[in-house]
């Protein structure tokens, strides 16, 4: 058995997270029409699949979850369908009888969402009613009947009806009817990338092929945050991979309850408002979502068991983009050796990611700390963490190092994305392609030194990658001064904000999180911790979510605060203003472990109705409420 066959046999042949019989069909085209009702807080719709049968099957099985299905038609004729009982987390299979002989067919289904829909959230926006969807990983089935697996990709035509402006996962098309919006997506996409948003949306340009959308009050801030870098990001990404194929790269800044940092919706990337920090320190999230235009959207993991193929590649490309931007800016500033500086910036970002990986491995379910997961009976949302992002990045960085660096790895990047574009693949196909590419170049022996078993299937951390620490060392020097001070037992504090004056955004984050990590092994007095806001007032006053979350972790973890202290009250109230799970889930865990479980639950109960259904469910699990 070859190593590729062995890797292939170690994961499921078919996606275990879908009830559909997707392997028996090719989806030629999908037409999806959605109608928004703000009064009823639901979305009704119609989906038409143009299918080609790959077997003699006499039934079509689609995924649904908490959907009302009213009619089903096959080749224009109404048929009797069966909606099987709901079983969490995979929903209710929709079984539609079809002719076993005809190779080509169209299937049409009418449906409506219910109040149990996990994909959509109706809220009151800043200027009026608002609805948005979030279908990753397996929530598209609660929006419309579908093959809810990344293993199926289809071109789409979308129609949306709403009294408010709509965006969907495609390029806007002309409409002659008020309240009706048309979109075309000629590039095949999977169900989790289907999206609808409707609200009082306005747009502003942030580049020659990019607009940003948001509600009016925040539009100018959104425009300022992204306009400096957007087109540069696209052009650099095109040099690393190849030409951007999606025509336009527009983005939408969503309300605060959006549960992720960003979501790579084709032609309309969704972004959390926590990115609007008014200092451009978080634009790397935009670089990440842009990178998804190749990794994830053009080339897709075939199931959520191979999620690292989406996210590991995306983080890798994101850091290449960020490094190249830094090098270009260094050259403009007349710095010596700008290319070297750009590489130092890339490595510095990798160090931040490595720290997140270490923290995740220490606190997460071990079975989900491998790159390839077994999701036969599990909800992919339960497996979601920094693992596929950061361990995936480190795997690709390890390969890059083994084959001789970026100059040797860059041709493979272009080859890989050209070979698999418009397709979905698994980890075995990736490894096989890697060997096919490098063996003729005399690098098979180098690849053979990579422990594929350990990287792909074993839980835990990989070996320390030994990143360039040049930019991190400035931070570590200050941290060591703090460690020495605590160990000395001195009481006169000699630190001030001047210590961090020269730090840039990412360095500040590294400083706070490294201090938090080092303090766990020291006897740090709560009195000293409570002095920190007066020593570093810029952190105490920061509106940047990355700084704010880390700063409050440092204070609450070691400050011996109670639920009646203003610091804890402030942080608890902040958790009610953000919906991004990156902040919300660790935030409640912090309250649980460092204040009290009762206070954590009480705070969650106060804000739970503000959170997106995905976020609400995950916090309930974290606090043992579900």
Swiss-Prot record:
Q: Which residues bind Zn(2+)?
A: 288, 292, 311
Report the GO terms under cellular component: cytosol; nucleus
The reply on keyword Cell membrane is no
Note the coiled coil stretches, chain numbering. none
Cofactors needed by this protein, per the record, are: Zn(2+)
Alphabetized UniProt keyword annotations = Cytoplasm, Hydrolase, Metal-binding, Metalloprotease, Nucleus, Protease, Zinc
Q: Which PROSITE patterns does the protein's record reference?
A: ZINC_PROTEASE
Catalytic activity annotation: an epoxide + H2O = an ethanediol
Q: What is its EC number?
A: 3.4.11.-, 3.3.2.10
Q: Spell out where the chain crosses the membrane.
A: none
List the catalytic residues. Answer: 289 (proton acceptor), 389 (proton donor)
Task: State the Gene Ontology BP annotations.
Answer: peptide catabolic process; proteolysis
Q: Where in the cell is it found?
A: Cytoplasm; Nucleus
Cofactor binding description: Binds 1 zinc ion per subunit.
In terms of domain of life, where is this protein from?
A: Eukaryota
The record's annotation in SMART domains points to: Leuk-A4-hydro_C
Where along this sequence does the record place binding of substrate? 134-136, 259-264
Top enzyme category: hydrolase
**Molecular functions (GO terms):** aminopeptidase activity; epoxide hydrolase activity; metallopeptidase activity; zinc ion binding
User: What is stated as this protein's family in its record?
Assistant: Belongs to the peptidase M1 family.
Q: What does this protein do?
A: Aminopeptidase that preferentially cleaves di- and tripeptides. Also has low epoxide hydrolase activity (in vitro). Can hydrolyze the epoxide leukotriene LTA(4) but it forms preferentially 5,6-dihydroxy-7,9,11,14-eicosatetraenoic acid rather than the cytokine leukotriene B(4) as the product compared to the homologous mammalian enzyme (in vitro).
Name the chain's protein: Leucine aminopeptidase 2-1
């Amino acid at each position: 058995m070859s190593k590729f066959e062995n890797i292939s046999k170690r994961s499921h042949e078919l996606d275990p997270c879908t009830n559909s019989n997707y392997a028996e069909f090719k989806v030629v085209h999908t037409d999806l029409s959605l109608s928004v009702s703000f009064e009823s807080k639901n979305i009704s719709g119609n989906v038409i699949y143009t299918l080609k049968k790959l077997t003699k099957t006499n039934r079509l099985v689609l995924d649904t979850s908490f959907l009302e299905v009213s009619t089903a038609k096959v080749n224009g004729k109404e048929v009797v369908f069966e909606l099987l009982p709901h079983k969490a987390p995979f929903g209710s299979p929709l079984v539609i009888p079809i002719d076993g002989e005809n190779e080509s067919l169209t299937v049409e289904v009418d449906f409506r969402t219910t109040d149990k829909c996990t994909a959509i959230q109706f809220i009151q926006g800043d200027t009026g009613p608002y609805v948005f969807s979030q279908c990753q990983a397996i929530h598209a089935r609660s929006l419309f009947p579908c093959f809810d697996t990344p293993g199926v990709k289809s071109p789409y035509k979308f129609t949306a009806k709403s009294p408010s402006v709509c965006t969907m996962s495609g390029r806007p098309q002309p409409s002659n009817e008020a309240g009706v919006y048309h979109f075309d997506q000629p590039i095949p996409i999977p169900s989790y990338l289907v999206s609808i948003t409707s609200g009082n949306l306005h747009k502003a340009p942030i580049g020659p092929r990019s607009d940003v959308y948001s509600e009016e009050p925040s539009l100018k801030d959104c425009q300022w945050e992204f306009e400096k870098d957007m087109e540069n990001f696209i052009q650099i990404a095109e040099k690393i991979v190849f030409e951007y194929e999606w025509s336009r790269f527009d983005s939408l800044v969503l309300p605060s309850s959006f549960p992720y940092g960003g979501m790579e919706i084709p032609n309309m990337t969704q972004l959390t408002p926590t990115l609007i920090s008014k200092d451009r320190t978080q634009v790397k999230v935009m670089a990440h979502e842009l990178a998804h235009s190749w990794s994830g959207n053009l080339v897709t993991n075939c199931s959520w068991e191979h999620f690292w193929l989406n996210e590991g590649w995306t983080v890798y490309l994101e850091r290449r983009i960020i490094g190249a931007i830094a090098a270009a800016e260094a050259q403009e500033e007349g710095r010596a050796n700008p290319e070297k500086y750009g590489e130092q910036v890339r490595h510095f970002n990798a160090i931040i990611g490595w720290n997140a990986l270490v923290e995740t491995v220490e606190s997460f379910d071990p079975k989900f700390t491998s790159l390839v997961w077994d999701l036969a009976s599990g909800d992919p949302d339960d497996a979601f963490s920094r693992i596929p992002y950061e361990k995936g990045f480190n795997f690709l960085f390890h390969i890059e190092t083994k084959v001789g660096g970026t100059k040797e790895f860059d041709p493979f990047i272009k080859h890989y994305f050209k070979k698999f574009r418009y397709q979905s693949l698994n980890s075995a196909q990736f490894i096989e392609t890697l060997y096919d590419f490098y063996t003729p170049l005399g690098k098979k022996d180098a690849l053979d030194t990579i422990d594929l078993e350990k990287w792909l299937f074993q839980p835990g951390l990989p070996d320390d990658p030994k990143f360039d620490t040049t930019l991190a060392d400035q931070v570590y020097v200050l941290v060591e001064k703090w460690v020495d001070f605590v160990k000395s037992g001195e009481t006169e504090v000699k630190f001030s904000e001047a210590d961090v004056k020269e730090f840039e955004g990412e360095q500040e984050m590294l400083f706070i999180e490294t201090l938090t990590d080092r303090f766990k092994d020291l006897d740090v007095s709560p009195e000293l911790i409570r002095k920190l806001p007066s020593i570093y007032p810029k952190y105490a006053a920061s509106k940047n979510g990355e700084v704010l979350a880390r700063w409050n972790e440092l204070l609450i973890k070691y400050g011996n605060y109670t639920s009646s202290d203003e610091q804890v009250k402030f942080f608890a109230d902040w958790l009610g203003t953000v919906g991004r799970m990156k902040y919300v889930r660790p935030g409640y865990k912090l309250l649980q472990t460092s204040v009290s479980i009762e206070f954590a639950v009480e705070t969650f109960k106060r804000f739970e109705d503000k959170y997106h259904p995905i976020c609400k469910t995950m916090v309930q699990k974290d606090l043992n409420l579900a």
